[in-house]
């Protein structure tokens, strides 16, 4: 059960934070179909930043001394860098959609096509191969919280809660959960959030009250890009073996499905992310999931084809959207370019 919960969180957290990214953009009135592309770019930037930092004196000293606080600081700094570059990358969509009033679906699709090509081009220049590794050696262990991080021997039993939520888990998981809560409160309990949502529902009415619709939409897409970029790095660190290869396994599109399934509401999105994370976990680790807890009968022993397990997350996506999309209520003005002269 510990393994299942930890792996579910590993898959659910990037989905949750990127789905919230989609909410911020669409609540402002812009369809951010480019979440996949921004994730790919954020993953690349995060991996490249750690790769560049691994040779610095501070990181080398922290590794040799076992200074886990400094390494966790590097993890947080990399999350911020990936978020910043994701925000910059999203400005391409903002400019095309807000200033040029281009079709937002086409603009997002263009970024989704450009991002993997650009990332692979840069990886070839940097590493002369198709995959960019974060660092030499087991870089995942740098950022993972373990018993040794807290000065406890690995033979000590922490019980179910400690073994599940404090051992062999990433600090980024809890940072993203905290960020998700804070941003959800900002979106629904602050003046900024009210203005942002007004621009996605009735921009003409918002404009008549003195709200700068263009500025609010830029803010929504920029926050969306920052979250998607951060989600891309978290995916690369926790799921993609600390590497970037111009692909995030469709997590950006899955996040869009989670957003729609969650009806653009943070609490629903959190639940949907855990559901999709569970099925991604089953698809990726079915051969290791112990059904009875005795280490004998594994999920793989049922006799179901491995291909079906790998299809599960995407089959569930289709089924969920088929049965819930009719009840979903998107912001009324999403996807519609705002013209100040129309009423």
Segments predicted by a language model, with ranges:
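Helix-loop-helix "hairpin" substructures at the membrane interface of multi-pass membrane proteins
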Residues: 164-243, 271
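Alpha-helical transmembrane segments within multi-pass membrane transporters and channels
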Residues: 60-116
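Membrane-interfacial amphipathic/re-entrant helices at transmembrane-helix boundaries
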Residues: 1-18, 31, 45, 52-77
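Loop-to-helix entry region at the N-terminal start of transmembrane alpha-helices
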Residues: 3-11, 156-182, 309-314
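Extracellular/periplasmic helix-loop junction at the C-terminal end of a transmembrane helix
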Residues: 116-161, 283-297, 326-335
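Transmembrane alpha-helical segments in multi-pass inner-membrane proteins
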Residues: 228, 239-314
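Cytosolic-side transmembrane-helix boundaries in multi-pass membrane proteins
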Residues: 183, 201-208, 213-215, 287-343
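Short loop segments and helix-boundary regions at transmembrane helix junctions
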Residues: 25-31, 91-152, 189, 249-250, ...
């Amino acid at each position: 059960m510990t393994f299942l919960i930890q792996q579910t969180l590993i898959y659910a957290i990037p989905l949750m934070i990127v789905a919230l990214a989609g909410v911020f953009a669409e609540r402002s009135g812009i369809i951010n179909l480019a979440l996949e592309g921004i994730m790919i770019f954020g993953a690349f930037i995060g991996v490249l930043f750690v790769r560049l930092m691994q040779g610095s004196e501070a990181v080398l000293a922290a590794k040799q001394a076992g200074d886990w606080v400094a390494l966790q600081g590097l993890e947080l700094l990399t999350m911020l860098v990936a978020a910043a570059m994701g925000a910059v990358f999203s400005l391409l969509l903002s400019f095309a959609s807000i200033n040029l009033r281009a079709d937002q679906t086409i603009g997002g699709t263009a970024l989704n096509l450009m991002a993997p090509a650009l990332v692979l081009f840069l990886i070839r220049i940097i590493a002369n191969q198709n995959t960019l590794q974060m660092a030499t050696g087991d870089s995942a262990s740098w950022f993972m919280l373990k018993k040794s991080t807290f000065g406890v021997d690995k033979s000590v039993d922490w019980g179910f809660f400690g073994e599940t939520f404090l051992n062999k888990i990433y600090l980024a998981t809890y940072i993203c959960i905290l960020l998700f809560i804070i941003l959800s409160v900002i979106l629904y309990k602050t003046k900024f959030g009210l203005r942002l949502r007004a621009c996605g529902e009735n921009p003409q009415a918002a404009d008549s009250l003195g709200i700068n619709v263009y500025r609010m939409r830029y803010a929504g897409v920029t926050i969306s890009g920052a979250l998607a970029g951060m989600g891309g790095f978290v995916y690369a660190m926790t799921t993609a073996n600390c590497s970037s290869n111009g692909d995030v396994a469709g997590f950006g599109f899955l996040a869009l499905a989670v957003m729609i399934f969650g009806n653009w509401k943070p609490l629903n999105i959190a639940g949907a992310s855990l559901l999709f994370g569970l099925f991604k976990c089953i698809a990726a680790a079915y051969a290791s999931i112990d059904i009875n807890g005795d280490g004998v009968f594994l999920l793989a022993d049922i006799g179901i084809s491995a291909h079906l397990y790998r299809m599960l997350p995407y089959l569930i996506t289709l089924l969920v959207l088929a049965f819930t999309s009719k009840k979903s209520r998107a912001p009324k003005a999403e996807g519609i370019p705002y013209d100040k002269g129309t009423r």
